[in-house]
């Protein structure tokens, strides 16, 4: 019994700790970009050319894509949830997963999130 418990803990604990570290690093990266005007500018350009160019708009309009600059988020509202939604998409919707298919990979996606955050109201 004791060996089984030790084995279980030694297998599960590293996975849990790894996942906790990933989320923390990712959120701090988005926060870092929010204080960098060049990163926010690049995020805006990427948003306009990728997201707003096809579905999402910079102003609330009657389109079938969600408006992203308010506090009403349907598919998660944390930075990590937004990252996951853009990366994997939303099943049974037009929101396809982009993966990390941006010129600078994940960094560009975090810059898009920083742009959205800096142009949205403070949500509780």
For the regions a protein language model found, what residue spans apply to each?
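Gly/Gly-Pro-rich "capping" loops immediately C-terminal to redox-active cysteine motifs
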Residues: 33-40, 44, 57-87
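The canonical Cys-X-X-Cys-His
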Residues: 43, 47-58, 112-116
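Electrostatic cytochrome c docking/interface patches
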Residues: 21-46, 124
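Bacterial N-terminal signal peptides
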Residues: 8-15
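Sequence contexts marking disulfide-bonded cysteines in secreted/extracellular proteins
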Residues: 21, 52, 56, 122-124
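C-terminal motif of bacterial Sec signal peptides marking the signal peptidase cleavage site
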Residues: 17-19
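Axial heme c-ligation environment in periplasmic c-type cytochrome domains
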Residues: 63-70, 87-124
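Bacterial N-terminal signal peptides that target proteins for export
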Residues: 1-7
């Amino acid at each position: 019994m004791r060996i089984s418990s030790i084995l279980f803990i030694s297998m599960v604990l590293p996975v849990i700790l790894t996942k906790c570290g990933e989320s923390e690093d990712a959120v701090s990266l988005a926060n870092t970009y929010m204080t960098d005007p060049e990163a926010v500018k690049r995020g805006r350009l990427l948003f306009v050319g990728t997201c707003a160019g096809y579905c999402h708009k910079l102003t609330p309009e009657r389109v079938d894509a969600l408006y992203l600059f308010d506090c009403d988020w349907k598919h998660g509202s944390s930075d990590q949830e937004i990252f996951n939604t853009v990366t994997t998409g939303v099943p049974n919707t037009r929101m396809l997963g982009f993966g990390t298919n941006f010129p600078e990979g994940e960094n560009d996606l975090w810059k898009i999130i920083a742009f959205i955050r800096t142009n949205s109201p403070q949500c509780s």
